[in-house]
């Protein structure tokens, strides 16, 4: 009889929450690397709340945008805090999502195909949102970043120029561009929220992967209380780091050029995106051809989709494949070095290093399955 059951098991809405956060059967051996999903949810909520307060004072107009952000920081109660939390919150969002994806590659969680595909879509949406958010303060780097990145579409044969003008809403970046970027920057986080729910829905169809990469149905425990407390440790650490950065060095990850109002007549010496796009920007710059660069840029993220198709191993997870582990960490270092190269000027040693690193980055996805097949032959034959 339902009368004796707790409300979380009988109420139509609470039942869904209960199945996702309280009574969810969870592998008992998942490590701290499995915390990052919930940390990403926390980051998203922080971004939506701080963004909502910022949008109350922000003005999407090229004459007023820069000064409205200035006004928020100087005159609004705790406006400086809300703005820097929002800007640095985005950085933490990307740190968490990159670790989350890295964990997915390391333990080969991409075999949960639907979850993985939705995750890649979320990554694209997040990148689009962050890019458009960077344009909103309408500083020098906002303006020129928007100019450079939207101009990449002109590399598309035949349709390119028309497409760029369509996105700009005119023949140059103007008020129409800022207004539409603001519109999409506002709506996309809610689409990300919806996609996150779909991501979770697919995950809960199959259950989580675990550090051993084997079926854990024999040894599952309820999510609450053990993993709720374990997640809370992650929340506290990330919240502390975010608040520490925001209160000690809030503009550390920003660009000094963005303290100057946008001026179409003066080009900054070195145009670069925020740090979390630098690896992709370095890949873009490594290809001498414009269209080739754009394709490489998109493929640097889209290549994640092919991972489930390159799985030919007998055991899941590279924790049992020493050579693949070395290869994985080389790839991680490659991405860090690409991030460094993206922030360097387009000069001789940097260009060549960027090209070498780009080849190394893409070759990981080719060499990794080959090495694992070779290792399987060594072990099983």
UniProtKB/Swiss-Prot annotation:
GO molecular function: metal ion binding; ubiquinol-cytochrome-c reductase activity
Membrane topology summary: Multi-pass membrane protein
Primary location group: mitochondrion
Residue pairs linked by disulfide bridges in the UniProt entry: none
Transmembrane segments: 36-56, 80-101, 116-136, 181-201, 229-249, 291-311, 323-343, 350-370
Cofactor (UniProt): heme b
Cofactor: binding comment: Binds 2 heme b groups non-covalently.
Localization in the cell: Mitochondrion inner membrane
Amino acids binding a ubiquinone: 204
GO cellular component: mitochondrial inner membrane; respiratory chain complex III
Record keywords, A-Z: Electron transport, Heme, Iron, Membrane, Metal-binding, Mitochondrion, Mitochondrion inner membrane, Respiratory chain, Transmembrane, Transmembrane helix, Transport, Ubiquinone
Role according to the record: Component of the ubiquinol-cytochrome c reductase complex (complex III or cytochrome b-c1 complex) that is part of the mitochondrial respiratory chain. The b-c1 complex mediates electron transfer from ubiquinol to cytochrome c. Contributes to the generation of a proton gradient across the mitochondrial membrane that is then used for ATP synthesis.
PANTHER family to which the protein is assigned, alphabetical: CYTOCHROME B (PTHR19271:SF16)
Record family assignment: Belongs to the cytochrome b family.
Note: Heme 1 (or BL or b562) is low-potential and absorbs at about 562 nm, and heme 2 (or BH or b566) is high-potential and absorbs at about 566 nm.
Name this protein carries in UniProt: Cytochrome b
């Amino acid at each position: 009889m339902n009368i004796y059951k707790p409300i979380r098991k009988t109420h139509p809405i609470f039942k869904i929450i209960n199945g996702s956060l309280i009574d969810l059967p969870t592998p008992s051996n998942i490590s701290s690397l499995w915390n990052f999903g919930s940390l990403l949810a926390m980051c998203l909520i922080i971004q939506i709340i701080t963004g909502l307060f910022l949008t109350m004072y922000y003005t999407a107009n090229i004459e007023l945008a820069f000064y409205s952000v200035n006004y928020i920081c100087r005159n609004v109660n705790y406006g400086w805090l809300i703005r820097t939390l929002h800007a640095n919150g985005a950085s933490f969002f990307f740190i968490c999502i990159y670790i989350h994806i890295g964990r997915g590659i390391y333990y080969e969680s991409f075999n949960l195909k639907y979850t993985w595909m939705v995750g890649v879509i979320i990554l694209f949406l997040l990148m689009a949102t962050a890019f458009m958010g960077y344009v909103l303060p309408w500083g020098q780097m906002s303006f020129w970043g928007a100019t450079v990145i939207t101009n990449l579409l002109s590399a598309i044969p035949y349709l390119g120029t028309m497409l760029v003008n369509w996105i700009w809403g005119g023949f140059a970046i103007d008020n129409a561009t800022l207004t539409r970027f603001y519109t999409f920057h506002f709506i996309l986080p809610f689409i990300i929220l919806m996609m996150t729910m779909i991501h979770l829905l697919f995950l809960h169809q199959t259950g989580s992967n675990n550090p051993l990469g084997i079926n854990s149905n024999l040894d599952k425990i309820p999510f609450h209380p053990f993993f709720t407390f374990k997640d809370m440790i992650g929340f506290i650490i990330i919240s502390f780091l975010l608040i520490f950065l925001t209160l000690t060095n809030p503009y550390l990850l920003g660009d000094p050029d963005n303290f100057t109002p946008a001026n179409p007549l003066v080009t900054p010496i070195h145009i670069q995106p925020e740090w979390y796009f630098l690896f992709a920007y370095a890949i873009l710059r490594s290809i001498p051809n414009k269209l080739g660069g754009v394709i490489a840029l998109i493929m640097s993220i889209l290549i994640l989709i092919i991972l489930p198709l390159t799985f030919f191993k007998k055991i899941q997870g590279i924790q049992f494949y020493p050579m693949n582990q070395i290869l994985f960490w080389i790839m991680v270092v490659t991405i860090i070095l690409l991030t460094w190269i993206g922030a360097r000027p387009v000069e001789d040693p940097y260009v060549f290093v960027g090209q070498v690193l780009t080849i190394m980055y893409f070759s990981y996805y080719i060499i990794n399955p080959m090495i694992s097949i070779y290792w399987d032959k060594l072990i099983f034959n």
